[in-house]
Amino acid sequence: MTGLDRERIVDGAPALSAEELQAALAGLPGWQLAGDGKSICREWRFKNFKQAAQLANLAAWQAEAAGHHPDIAFGWGHARVSYSTHSAGGVSRNDLIMAARLDAATG
């Protein structure tokens, strides 16, 4: 998935097939298909609330800049980000791009 974080978000991106999604997730360590089968998610653990809030804010700022918004949950010592393309009814390449951007920003 080299360079995925630099790809453009495209309106109307279709949902990926199960095979495409599994292949793509292999290049995004830590990301997995959620139980609903229609979103990808990743969880982080931190030493305090501040770090969890910083990750949540980073994901939110990236989402606003791209116009593609995840579900974000966080609390003391943990954060979870989930991406799905609701208009496509599942995971699109846009979700993978946003996951890669978040990974690139968090190192």
UniProtKB/Swiss-Prot annotation:
Swiss-Prot/TrEMBL keywords: Lyase
Transmembrane segments: none
Enzyme class: lyase
Lineage: Bacteria, Pseudomonadati, Pseudomonadota, Alphaproteobacteria, Rhodobacterales
InterPro entries with a match to the protein in the record: PCD_sf (IPR036428), Pterin_deHydtase (IPR001533)
One GO-annotated biological process of the protein: tetrahydrobiopterin biosynthetic process
Tree of life domain: Bacteria
Species name: Paracoccus denitrificans (strain Pd 1222)
Protein's recorded name: Putative pterin-4-alpha-carbinolamine dehydratase
